[in-house]
């Protein structure tokens, strides 16, 4: 019926519409990050003697704030997409099956294994990549900061927001018309490129 074709991702779309639908969530995160950063710099320019240094001191908090704000539209679009997928028959309208303890452990081990793979890849590419600038920047951002604060903002909030944007939205939207391996590779590449440097890009992908 008319409602089905209006809601369902299965409705006919041209390539431009598909690229836009899969890509604009990146723009949402980028715009929010720029608004947060621009506002912070404007405030620091008026209140701090060294606005650049003050900005570095608050980078962890600003990164987390960006994540929290990005979660709001991400949740909205994810829920809307879910309604469309159910209406279009892409997913069944049934309750989620909870993971067993064994499945959770296996997923954690798989994540740890992939992290080790990232470390191994970085070791191979170390001779070709100059990561000193990135390391210096991270040292400047994290120096003197509380471990709990870094874990909360940069280890939980920021990654969770990026997962919502890049996995819940971009990956699942690519899955609406692409096979899983292709969608995973494309979304991973977008995730890595968005970070703006090779070091983070390898881990993000």
Predicted regions and their residues:
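N-terminal juxtamembrane cytosolic/stromal segments of multi-pass membrane proteins
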Residues: 1-23, 82-90
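Hydrophobic alpha-helical transmembrane segments
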Residues: 19-27, 60-61, 101-109, 148-152, ...
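Alpha-helical transmembrane segments in multi-pass membrane proteins
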Residues: 25-82
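Aromatic-anchored segments of alpha-helical transmembrane domains
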Residues: 30-35, 112-117, 188-197
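Membrane-interface elements of multi-pass transporters and channels
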Residues: 35-51, 80-85, 124-136, 168, ...
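Juxtamembrane helix-loop-helix connectors linking adjacent transmembrane helices
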Residues: 53-57, 86-161, 176
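Transmembrane helix-loop-helix hairpins at the membrane interface
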Residues: 145-205
């Amino acid at each position: 019926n008319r409602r089905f074709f209006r809601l369902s991702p299965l409705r006919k779309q041209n390539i431009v519409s598909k690229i836009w639908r899969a890509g604009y969530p990146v723009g949402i995160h980028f715009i929010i990050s720029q608004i947060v950063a621009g506002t912070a710099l404007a405030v620091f320019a008026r209140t701090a003697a060294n606005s650049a240094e003050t900005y570095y001191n608050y980078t962890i908090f600003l990164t987390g704030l960006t994540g929290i704000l990005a979660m709001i539209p991400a949740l909205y679009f994810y829920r809307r997409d879910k309604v469309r997928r159910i209406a279009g028959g892409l997913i069944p309208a049934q309750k989620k099956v909870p993971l067993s303890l064994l499945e959770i452990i296996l997923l954690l081990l798989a994540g740890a294994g992939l992290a080790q793979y990232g470390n191994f890849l970085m070791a191979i590419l170390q001779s070709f990549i100059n990561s000193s600038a990135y390391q210096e920047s991270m040292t400047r951002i994290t120096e003197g900061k509380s471990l709990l604060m870094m874990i909360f903002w940069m280890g939980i909030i920021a990654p969770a927001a990026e997962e919502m944007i890049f996995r819940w939205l971009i990956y699942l939207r690519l899955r609406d018309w692409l096979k899983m391996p292709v969608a995973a590779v494309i979304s991973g590449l977008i995730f890595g490129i968005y970070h703006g440097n090779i070091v983070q890009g390898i881990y993000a992908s």
